[in-house]
Amino acid sequence: MIHRPGPVKPRLRGLLHLYAFFASLPALAVLLLACQTGRAAVAATVYGLSLVALFGVSALFHRVTWSPRARRWMGRLDHAMINVSIAATFTPFGLLVLSGTLATVSLAAVWGGALGGILLHVLWIDAPKSLSAVVYVVLGCSGITALPQLVSQVGWGPTGLLALGGALYSAGAAVYAFRRPDPAPGVFGYHEVFHGLVIAAAVTHYVVVAVYVLPHV
C-alpha cells in the first residue's frame, strides 16, 4: 500500500489567533473597568470571555499537532466556540441597548441558534465547510430585526461599525467555505486569511461594545 501524506499545515497556522488570544486578556480587563453597573459587568464578562475562549481554543487547536481522535474533539470545540462567540457578541446589545420583548426574543433566538450550531458540529463533525459557513452567517444575522431599535439607541455610526464587522465575518466565512484566496499554502493559506478577517471583525465589534454599548447604561 502506498502511503499518501496528508496536506502540509501552513507554518503560520493558528499564529494569528494565538496573538489575538494574548490580546484578548487585557481587552477583557478594559471592558470590566468600563462597567458602571452589575448588568454591564455581566454583559462584558460574557462577551469578553467568549473572545478569550474563541481565540484560545482556536490557537490550541491549530498550533498543536493532535492525534486523529483528539483532533476531531478539538475540532468540535473550535466550532462550538465560534457559535458561542457569535451569541456572546450580541449579548451586550441585548442586555444593555435593546429593551422589552425584542431584547428577550432576540437574545433567546441568538443563543438558541448557537446551541443548534454546536449540536450540528458535535453530531456531524465532518459537515461541509460550506454548511458551517452558512450556519455562522445565518446565526450572525439572526439579530437583524433589532436594527431599528439599535439605530435609535446608539446611532448610525456604531450601527455602521457593527455592520462592517458583520461583513468582515461574512467575508471570512466565504473564504473558509471556498478555500480562496490561498496565497501561500505552505506558509499563509486560506485558513490564515479567514483567521485574519475574524480578528478584524472582532476588533470592530469590540470598539462598538467598549466605546458605545457599555457606557450606554
Q: What positions do the PLM features span?
A:
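Multi-pass alpha-helical transmembrane bundles in non-GPCR membrane proteins
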Residues: 1-217
